[in-house]
């Protein structure tokens, strides 16, 4: 799945991404990079609203799992189970979120567990950059669930 395909998917299936004007910058096995402008995500302090920052970080993390699972040829529902967001600096500009697997060496185990149990859990991180600085970090636990058979 390339950047255009992912962006089309997000806009069709996660309408909030379109409202926030999120664009897909890069899709790689090591991470997904998303970008969002300040204007539709602004708060009363003329910086990025914390909820927008969190949403873009979660979207980047979810997108990484989505693209990796699809590349494996597996159909799975992906949901976030829990997350922690650390806000380091206010963002007064357009911003990006770059996701990564917290422990890349756990991917084979994740896929084996999913194949055997029909569900598996994995931690994904995302780092937000704004104004040329790391502004926030997300750590999230995501769960892959087998799709029900008709």
Predicted regions and their residues:
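Short structured motifs
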Residues: 18-22, 81-87, 109-111
